[in-house]
């Protein structure tokens, strides 16, 4: 039979030349060719070689042994110690607990160590997180204490005298310490065992590490593959957007909402070429290849996948505005299907519907593969073949490829051959050229939300479609759809945060200053009380607006999951409303934090503060403050209180991991009644486990404080100018019960000073005094204070004053000075003389500070004042955050390792009692009132 179209000579040549693109087949020729192909299809239907492909939903029904897949998943979960998390899923709070593991850089020894090793390293943004290598011959103290007894029970000791025949099968089924685990199997097992919020955290951290993200999660146990839309909701990316005409600018958006062309890479039957290696090469600019997709040449990459076949991964290329780095002019998504398309047809169908082009890697095109692809004849997607043909298969491949040309509407330029002699660099350039040609022509652009919509139509489960998530989303939309202008909404709906609150905060500051006066006039004190009462009565005269009432209903839900869903939806919904688009050069915007460039005026923010969840909680706090003030003054009977339950609601949010505002970023004051009420409720909920260590960070904006805390403890403090509120926030970390006695506390309360310390000079008057007071408050509440610096000698004057004031009170936290190199990852760290300079006797600034605090010549070197020894790890150099140029840069391994070492030292200091006396919550409440 004559082959339709133009004869394919490509396979005979053994290479593909993109420079010689054959003409497209005419419409009349294509109709004839397709008709011939239809005839051949019917002929093959009668062949005895019946072909069936898996649809991804009922694979077990087509299998003679339907329990094989089920047992394979169960064996993997059991091997990894995750079988107990199939009903009660592993939560984010579980994964963040401080334990023995937190203080040791131990290597996993048995498969059950692998999930925890992965989570711990991923939390620290460690590029080695995916490595599943286990080390058996290690020193005894290299393994966590709490797991030693467990390991002794698991190790199987073989006695040669035993009856081998009687026990060989049971022995081979038991997990052994050297059982290799493919990293993709580990990821799938962990995601299947995690709740929605831990899945989201895993995806967020993987994105920061520039790992490929799971998009479709296979579940061979229930034959329900899940599209992970919710898991990717929190991922924001920044890239250079260059319109065809006009000036380019940086754009920041969610990967879920932004649309981009998508290109899928799949395998049909077998392929000698690695899809993942090819994708990594295409995505990597210059000569530095980043292993975004795990591939066969990496450690344990050749291990058989037990449960991760059918996994679809996604990664993006984002332009930076630099010609030497930008492979493509716009964002591009790349998708990778693990496994053969014939066994995972549902996933393949999804990829063909969402992709602008699909690259099919195969060594063989026979009758089975032809019938498989023939069913795609109505598809409008572009198809490209990357072949590495078997010796002796040339004629078969040629015959069926010629049949597919009219069916898939392709020509010779859509077929590439890559064999061992093919130059890899040239081949990668060809792939990039194809992608570039598709981008220049009209092509479909899809967001992850669009992909999820296509997945639903095909019958895939979408994680976001659960009832609790959708109810929370509906509630969020009822609030945000009324927000047309953030400033107007704050003025009209959050009424207690206007002038009455600012005036009340000012009166309370004056009243507090009178407390320290030698002989304050009683008349002035009474006047301040009267003014404060008037302002509080004015606030109490309002009722919560409809939006605030809806918010209160959302956080009052009896379902913990619905409450957490609602808070996440509110964060994203409010961020979407704000639509902040900064216009800054790449070196400032893409570092996730502003440069340190002089002083900050606390009265005038450097950027507009976005409307956030903290504003709704602040409104609740003001209702509680006003009501409490009236009760204290005898103007309102305690039995008539309407808002007494508000602190309890807020304390529950703190326990779920939400950062709560400690110092108001608008008035730069602490709502004492609200904070103490919240801590009292926290004390009630924690019951016997209320011993606290307070750890704070202070320093000027732009020194990486929030990123440091988030990396160290897995916290959620806001980073970057566009989303950072100005106040100080606190988050609670739980210490595992088995470790709390050893560490000496049950929880660690972490305080991030945000943008409160602006580096004001002493000549700035009231502004400087305000900064010094705030620094004194934050450091005075703390057992441990991390001083974050942008320069080795750059200690803000306000912090020097706080040192002096705290020395007079006798309260001296354990200080750690952290110098962060914000730009150069190659700098090894400050030299010893640099460390000495930081703590040397003070110059003019220190002497002036001493005179203001009336300490005269008694001012000592900072080394003595802060109990620092430069040789004993009180001063830290943290390398740059990024390895490479953002937005395609990954987090530096040196940064991750330095943060881990700082964390280990902090915990060791707490454990050894070097962090001053630990507190319980009641003592912290008294300290808040006193300070």
Curated annotation (Swiss-Prot):
Disulfide cysteine pairs (residue numbers): none
Protein's UniProt keywords contain Nucleotide-binding: yes
InterPro entries tied to this protein: G_VLIG_dom, GTP-bd, P-loop_NTPase
Organism listed in the record: Pongo abelii
Keywords: Cell cycle, Cytoplasm, GTP-binding, Nucleotide-binding, Nucleus, Phosphoprotein
Name this protein carries in UniProt: Up-regulator of cell proliferation
Principal place of residence: cytoplasm
Phosphoserine PTM sites in chain numbering: 3
């Amino acid at each position: 039979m004559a082959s339709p179209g133009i004869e394919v000579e490509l396979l005979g040549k053994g290479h593909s030349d993109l420079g010689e693109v054959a003409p497209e087949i005419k419409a009349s020729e294509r109709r004839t060719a397709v008709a011939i192909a239809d005839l051949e299809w019917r002929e093959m239907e009668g062949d005895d070689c019946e072909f069936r492909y898996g649809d991804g939903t009922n694979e077990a029904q087509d299998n003679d042994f339907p329990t094989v897949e089920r047992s394979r998943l169960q064996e993997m979960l059991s091997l990894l110690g995750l079988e107990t998390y199939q009903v009660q899923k592993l939560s984010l709070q579980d994964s963040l607990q401080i334990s023995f593991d937190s203080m040791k850089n131990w290597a996993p020894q048995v498969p059950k160590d692998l999930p925890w090793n992965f989570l711990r390293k991923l939390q620290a943004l460690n590029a080695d997180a995916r490595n599943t290598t286990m080390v058996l011959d290690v020193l005894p103290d290299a393994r966590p204490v709490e797991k030693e007894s467990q390991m002794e029970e698991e190790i199987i000791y073989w006695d040669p005298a035993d009856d081998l025949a009687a026990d060989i099968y049971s022995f081979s089924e038991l997990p052994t310490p050297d059982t290799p685990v493919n990293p993709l199997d580990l990821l799938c097992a962990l995601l299947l065992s995690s709740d929605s919020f831990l899945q989201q955290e895993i995806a967020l951290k993987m994105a920061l590490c520039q790992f490929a993200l799971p998009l479709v999660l296979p579940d061979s146990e229930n034959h329900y593959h899940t599209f992970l839309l919710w898991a990717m909701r929190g991922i924001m990316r920044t890239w250079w957007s260059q319109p065809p005409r006009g000036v380019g600018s940086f754009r920041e958006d969610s990967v879920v909402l932004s649309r981009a062309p998508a290109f899928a890479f799949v395998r049909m039957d077998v392929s000698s070429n690695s899809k993942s290696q090819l994708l990594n090469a295409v995505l990597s600019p210059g000569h530095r290849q980043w292993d975004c997709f795990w591939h066969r040449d990496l450690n344990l990459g050749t291990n058989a996948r037990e449960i991760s076949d059918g996994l679809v991964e996604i990664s993006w290329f984002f332009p930076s505005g630099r010609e030497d780095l930008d492979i493509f002019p716009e964002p591009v998504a790349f998708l990778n299907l693990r496994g053969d398309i014939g066994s995972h047809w549902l996933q393949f169908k999804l990829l063909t519907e969402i992709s602008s082009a699909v690259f099919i890697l195969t060594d063989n095109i026979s009758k089975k593969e032809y019938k498989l692809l023939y069913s795609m004849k109505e598809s409008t997607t572009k198809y490209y073949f990357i072949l590495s043909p078997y010796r002796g298969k040339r004629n078969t491949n040629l015959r069926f490829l010629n049949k597919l040309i009219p069916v898939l509407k392709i020509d010779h330029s859509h077929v590439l051959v890559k064999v061992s002699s093919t130059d890899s660099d040239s081949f990668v350039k060809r792939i990039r050229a194809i992608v570039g040609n598709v981008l220049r022509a009209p092509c479909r652009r899809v967001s992850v939300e669009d992909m999820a919509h296509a997945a639903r139509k095909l019958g895939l489960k979408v994680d976001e479609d659960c009832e609790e998530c959708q109810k929370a989303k509906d509630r969020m939309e009822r609030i945000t759809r009324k927000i047309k202008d953030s400033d107007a909404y704050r003025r009209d709906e959050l009424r207690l945060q206007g002038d009455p609150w600012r005036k009340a905060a000012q009166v309370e500051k004056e009243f507090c200053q009178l407390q320290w006066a030698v002989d304050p006039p009683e008349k002035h004190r009474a006047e301040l009380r009267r003014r404060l009462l008037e302002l509080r009565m004015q606030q109490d005269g309002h009722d919560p607006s409809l939006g605030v009432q809806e918010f209160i209903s959302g956080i009052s839900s009896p379902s913990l999951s619905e409450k957490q869903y609602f808070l996440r939806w509110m964060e994203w919904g409010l961020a979407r409303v704000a639509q902040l688009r900064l216009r800054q050069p790449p070196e400032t915007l893409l570092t996730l934090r502003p440069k340190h460039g002089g002083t900050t005026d606390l009265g005038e923010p450097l950027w507009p503060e976005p409307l956030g969840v903290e504003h709704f909680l602040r409104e609740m706090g003001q209702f509680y403050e006003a009501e409490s003030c009236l009760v204290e003054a005898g103007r309102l009977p305690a039995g008539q209180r309407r808002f007494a339950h508000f602190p309890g609601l807020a304390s529950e949010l703190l326990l779920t991991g939400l950062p709560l505002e400690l110092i108001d970023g608008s008035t730069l004051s602490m709502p004492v009644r609200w904070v103490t009420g919240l801590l009292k409720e926290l004390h009630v909920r924690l019951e016997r486990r209320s011993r606290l260590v307070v750890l704070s960070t202070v320093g000027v904006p732009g020194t990486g404080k929030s990123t440091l805390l988030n990396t160290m403890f897995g916290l959620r403090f806001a980073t970057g100018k566009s989303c950072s509120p100005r106040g100080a926030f606190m988050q609670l970390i739980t210490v595992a019960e088995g470790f709390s006695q050893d560490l000496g506390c049950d929880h660690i309360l972490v305080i991030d000073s945000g943008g409160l310390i602006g580096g004001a000079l002493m000549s700035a008057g009231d502004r400087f005094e305000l900064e010094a007071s705030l620094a004194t408050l934050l450091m005075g509440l703390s057992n441990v204070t991390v001083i974050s610096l942008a320069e080795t000698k750059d200690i803000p004057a306000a912090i020097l004053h706080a040192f002096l004031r705290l020395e007079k009170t006798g309260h001296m936290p354990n200080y750690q000075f952290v110098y962060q190199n914000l730009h150069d990852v190659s700098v090894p760290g400050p030299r010893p003389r640099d460390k000495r300079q930081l703590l040397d006797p003070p110059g003019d600034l220190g002497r002036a500070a001493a005179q203001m605090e009336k300490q005269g010549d008694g001012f000592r070197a900072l080394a003595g004042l802060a109990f620092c020894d430069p040789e004993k790890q009180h001063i830290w150099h943290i390398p740059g955050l990024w390895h490479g140029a953002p937005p395609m840069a990954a987090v530096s391994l040196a940064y991750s390792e330095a943060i881990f070492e700082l964390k280990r030292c902090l915990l060791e200091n707490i454990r050894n009692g070097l962090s001053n006396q630990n507190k319980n919550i009641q003592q912290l409440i008294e300290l808040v009132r006193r300070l």
